[in-house]
Amino acid sequence: MNQNGTRLCYSVREVPPTSFVSAPANYKRASSHCTYTIPAASALTVLYYPFFTAQDRCKICILITIAILATLPWDSYLIRSAIWTYPPDAVVGLKILDIPIEEVFFFAIQTYITSLTYCIFTKPLVRPMYLRSHLERRGTRYVVATVILALMGGGTACLLLGRRMTYLGLILVWACPILLFQWMMSYPFLSELPWKPTITSICLPTLHLWFADSRAMGTGTWRIEEGTKLNFRIGGLELEEALFFLVSNMMVVLGLVGCDYAYALQEYESLSQPASDVYITLRKALSLLARPLPIDASLISALSQAVYRLQEKSQSMFLGSALFQGQLRIDLIFLYSFCRVMDDLIDEAEDEQEARFWVTECRHLLDSTHRSEPHSDHFYTGKKGEEHERLRQSISYLPPSHLSNDSFDDLLKGFEIDLKFNPQREAFPIQSEYCLDQYAGFVAGTVGVLVFDLTLFHCGHYFIQDVPRLRRAAKDMGKAMQCQPRGDGGATSGRKRAIAGNRGELYGYWTTAEGAERHKPGASVEDEGAFGATAKSWLAGDVITELCHCFIQAEYVIYLVRHQNASADTLVLLSALVYRLE
């Protein structure tokens, strides 16, 4: 029977009228899901479960809904036109618009698999750093749009030609308008994203589904009727089917990119306008797509530098921060970036005098920031000028209203103790467990408190009377991480050990168990005396046991897990966040 003059005798079998029940049920198509798609989805879910956020669930649910609604009419037309056919004994029997329920389930699970793959590979990305003005790269925008329009025109031509070009034309005419809309909406963000995570998120699910579909077609679960396809195969799979999986996964990934673009705009708005609402919802975020924001290039540059700094020098903290989201994650990145900048200035100082200069300058800049005073103009040249600008910039992006000036003061006291780790001094600065506890409190303990203060600001707390106890738990947790045993038999405190070792100046940081003898300068890195008997004694002592006990049972951990909507695996992240300043 002719249909619009384009198909001739395609109806190989009579297609029954629309109904929800068909004759004898079989589970061949369902078994294909049990073999290929459900195991893949389950494995990805288990892998990504500790990192699931409300934003992820929202994006995936919306994409699945859109995928089903967008595909149902198109797929129903293919089946009613007998381009796709299913043996009656290959499906369970339930149908929606003549589409077997197994096929409808496939739309959902394909979207779910591709979405999870995208979430896994893009989890470390800090979304606002890829924002650019919508006026940039307009040439790229129009070139890609022209290519998509050309493909859509080619699909229309295929439909007009009919016969063996029919299925190919239907795929292009269905997919290209959606791809064009997605590209025009999100091109400023998409063109700046790293290409590897995006391409991988498309290719891996596509390859998996190519294999699964070729096996399903090989067993006769379903087929494309002769006369509607090109009869060109790629590894046993029809060319049109390979193209379908490729473009459908592209639509899913571009849809997720569009959601991330909207989230990135709202995160940027919160970053550039601190008075704006800190709670991010997809509805609020999507509204920003209709009114592009002016992008401050200097702010994006500062965020990018902070991210690159952590990627290079504090990889564990950067990866761990991915469990947080939105403005909280950005504030944590700026906070830890400041710690890294200050730590590097102290470690790389040529002498103690220069190191003390940076501590004094840092204290002055922090005080000015907390008093909302403009930073005084100091003109330095050469390397010192670059270092001063790096310090000034790292402090200028800290959120002073969320953080206590006393905490920063304690952190600077920890840096001042670091200056006493000098092989030329007669006395080692840590002479007792009390000194060790105090040093750990000034360094990692303070970082734990700062992290808690940021979390409290962004997430809030119902019982204000619990806040002091939670802050103490945060500090104890930081101290426990500072003093935790390491694989080399040492401890994380005494971070100068690695620096001195690199200079060939490693000296005995620890007194002996009796406290009567100090190791001489020049001990090698391998020297057992480098950490001495007292270090081992302290690590086995009651003080460390108590600190670790506080860490394990800290209500602070429970608080963060509860308010960040994450699982108990957040402990891994927290360990990275309050880890010593390496």
From Swiss-Prot:
Residue stretches spanning the membrane: 34-54, 59-79, 99-121, 142-162, 170-190, 242-262
Alphabetical keyword list: Carotenoid biosynthesis, Isomerase, Membrane, Multifunctional enzyme, Transferase, Transmembrane, Transmembrane helix
Molecular function (Gene Ontology), one example: intramolecular lyase activity
Gene3D superfamilies hit by this protein: Farnesyl Diphosphate Synthase
Catalytic activities: all-trans-lycopene = gamma-carotene; gamma-carotene = all-trans-beta-carotene; 2 (2E,6E,10E)-geranylgeranyl diphosphate = 15-cis-phytoene + 2 diphosphate
Pathway(s) it belongs to: Carotenoid biosynthesis; beta-carotene biosynthesis; Carotenoid biosynthesis; phytoene biosynthesis; all-trans-phytoene from geranylgeranyl diphosphate: step 1/1
Subcellular location: Membrane
Topology class, membrane: Multi-pass membrane protein
Reported function: Bifunctional enzyme that catalyzes the reactions from geranylgeranyl diphosphate to phytoene (phytoene synthase) and lycopene to beta-carotene via the intermediate gamma-carotene (lycopene cyclase).
Similarity annotation: In the N-terminal section; belongs to the lycopene beta-cyclase family. In the C-terminal section; belongs to the phytoene/squalene synthase family.
Name the UniProt record assigns to this protein: Bifunctional lycopene cyclase/phytoene synthase
Natural source organism: Aspergillus niger (strain ATCC MYA-4892 / CBS 513.88 / FGSC A1513)
